[in-house]
A protein has these predicted regions:
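Conserved phosphate/oxyanion-binding catalytic-loop motifs
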Residues: 1
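C-terminal subregions of glycosyltransferases and related glycan-biosynthesis enzymes
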Residues: 62, 74-179
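Conserved nucleotide-sugar donor-binding catalytic segment
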Residues: 4-93
């Protein structure tokens, strides 16, 4: 309904915030739900969307995170300013597939987010592992090797090779246990 929102309300009419506050780990009161973002044209033009051969989508979070990292804030109103309808073939419906099919943009987004948020090494390792698992167990046409995963996510190649060995060992152990 036009009067319902998935957004968590707050008690002020608006809030000035960094777009990094969309992430739970960055803020005690993250900006959640569906919100409309409006930017000055001059600012948006300053932050170009990176392009990668063979990829036709990159999450807008790449440019938003860069703006936030450079100190820009947005004013978020606690009011419904737009009404939308999810489309069966829209971005939300395509879920993780849009990232799997565009691994360089996906890796750039995750790598920069970790850098801008000063993620500790252990958290980066979890992110690298998840990226590796997602991009090595997907449809054959989109599958990456360990070296590509390392390059796109900014991880040490040796870590990715260790992940490959660990996954093979785990799969072999599962087969043995099933017998």
């Amino acid at each position: 309904s036009p009067t319902e929102t998935p957004n968590t309300p707050w008690h002020e009419p608006y809030r000035d915030a960094s777009l990094l506050e969309r992430y739970d780990e960055y803020s005690d009161h993250p900006i959640d739900g569906e919100r409309a973002w409006v930017f000055y044209t001059e600012l948006q033009k300053k932050y170009k969307y990176p392009e990668f051969d063979g990829e036709n989508f990159i999450t807008p979070a790449v440019t938003w995170n860069r703006m936030a990292h450079d100190g820009y804030k947005v004013r978020i109103y606690d009011d419904i300013i737009w009404v939308y309808e999810y489309q069966p073939d829209g971005l939300t419906a395509s879920g993780n597939n849009r990232f799997i099919r565009r691994p360089q943009g996906h890796g750039l987004w995750l790598r920069e987010k970790a850098e801008f948020m000063n993620d500790p090494f252990r958290k980066k390792m979890k992110m690298w592992y998840t990226f590796y698992c997602d991009h090595t167990s997907c449809e054959e046409a989109y599958r990456l090797n360990a070296k590509q995963c390392a390059e796109y996510i900014g991880a040490p190649v040796s870590f990715m090779y260790a992940m490959a060995a660990a996954r093979k060992a785990a799969a072999a152990m599962k087969k043995v246990i099933k017998r």
